Amino acid sequence: MENNVKKETIVDSEKVEKQQPVTAPVVNKKENTQPKAKTFKRETTTSNFEERVVKIKRISKTTKGGRMMRFSALVVIGDKNGTVGFGMGKSIEVPDAIKKAIKNANNNLIKVKQTKKGSIYHDVNGRHGAAKVMLLPAPEGTGIIAGGPVRAVVELAGFTDIYTKSRGANAPMNVIRATINGLLQQLTPQEIARLRDKSLKEL
């Protein structure tokens, strides 16, 4: 009996060896795993810019349900190196209105000319609507003779010595536009010489 049991066990073991082992398919974890999305830090172009809130006022909009109260903010930004911009934002909350105004100002950046001493090249007169702004060069050490929205524009643009005079309407938005229009009228000595077909020494 013992011999028969041994033979059966030997036969069974031989059958097991002859049978091909069933192996589970190898799963490549690297292939199945989806690549992680890369996170990029968006660099803001206005990191070196300064903001100045010129005016905040409360506005209302009449709807079927009644009056909807909101706030509007007028902001001027600049890098004090010849780049300046302005924008307006509206929202239910004042901070949100200021953020929208800054975002709008980023899309309205302009480059203005200035001398090495921080003044303008010559007299200019800017106008927008009924607002008029006169800008005059000033000697070094004079400072900024301006007030209100005009001062915000010339300071953030980087001017250090300048005379200004605002006349006509005093709406902040129109005054800012008039100031920028005046600054854009500047001509450098090289540009004036080119227009007159003369050299710098002949001017």
UniProtKB/Swiss-Prot annotation:
Q: Which GO terms describe its molecular function?
A: rRNA binding; structural constituent of ribosome
A Gene Ontology biological process in which this protein takes part is:
translation
Record's keyword terms, sorted? Ribonucleoprotein, Ribosomal protein, RNA-binding, rRNA-binding
Q: Where is the S5 DRBM domain?
A: 49-112
Query: Can you quote a single GO CC term?
Result: small ribosomal subunit
**Which Pfam families did the record assign?**
Ribosomal_S5, Ribosomal_S5_C
What this chain does, per the entry, is described as: With S4 and S12 plays an important role in translational accuracy. Located at the back of the 30S subunit body where it stabilizes the conformation of the head with respect to the body.
Query: What family does this belong to?
Result: Belongs to the universal ribosomal protein uS5 family.
The record describes its quaternary structure and partners as: Part of the 30S ribosomal subunit. Contacts proteins S4 and S8.
* NCBIfam families (alphabetical): rpsE_bact
This chain belongs to which protein, by name?
A: Small ribosomal subunit protein uS5
